[in-house]
Amino acid sequence: MGRSPCCEKAHTNKGAWTKEEDDRLTAYIKAHGEGCWRSLPKAAGLLRCGKSCRLRWINYLRPDLKRGNFSHEEDELIIKLHSLLGNKWSLIAGRLPGRTDNEIKNYWNTHIRRKLTSRGIDPVTHRAINSDHAASNITISFESAQRDDKGAVFRRDAEPAKAAAAAAAISHHVDHHHRSNPQLDWGQGKPLKCPDLNLDLCISPPIHEDPMVDTKPVVKREAGVGVGVVGLCFSCSMGLPRSSDCKCSSFMGLRTAMLDFRSIEMK
């Protein structure tokens, strides 16, 4: 349920207040105080709504109301309060004695907004208008910097392709030079020879080593070349087919010796 109306609208006057109504309302409030605005019109003998009586008293008939223009100090106070409170005109009016919220609101919209704009200040945010433009310029420059970074990335991506193209050109030039001068080669005209290695696999039974006996093979070296392990003939040490004179040990026809290729020591 909503609030009941403060008066009967059928028996109330509307429109501008007359001087007689102002005098009657002023005399009643001076004698009895403000009291309840719902019952005040009937007690004062006025055919007005309680809300209309309240607004007429607060905005026009109060004895402490200030008449005339706003001072420079009041202008600065209104600007400072508006920057803190915003459009809460009733709170701003409470800090300016003798001024009403409706009066301050009208004065703000007609005078103070223009004054702040002429100073280069935004009347809504109370910040310099030039700073807003500077912020937009900073945003634009930041976007351009991002574009530059992307362009730099594209350039860095293109550098490996250029390096590969340069390497291909150098390789083509070297090949062409070798074809035109066949005598100039890395081996000075001599073909490179790979050492002959015996890649045949041999299977040998497991060897049981005595921990008390040194099992290191004895290698015979002649003129810096390893001949083989003692106990192997020359043919077996070089991986050649066995001759009729081979007396190397064997087990069920399987060779039990390991080959020694040039006695290479692996560390």
UniProtKB/Swiss-Prot annotation:
Cited Pfam families: Myb_DNA-binding (PF00249)
Q: Which GO MF terms does the UniProt record name?
A: DNA binding
Where is it mostly found? nucleus
Matching entries from SMART domains are given as: SANT (SM00717)
Q: Where does the UniProt annotation locate this protein? A: Nucleus
Question: Which Gene3D superfamilies does the entry mention?
Answer: Homeodomain-like
One GO cellular component this record assigns the protein to is: nucleus
Q: Which UniProt keywords apply?
A: Activator, DNA-binding, Nucleus, Repeat, Transcription, Transcription regulation
Which ranges of the sequence are annotated as binding DNA?
37-61, 89-112
Identification of the protein by name: Myb-related protein Hv1
Q: Which organism is it from?
A: Hordeum vulgare (Barley)
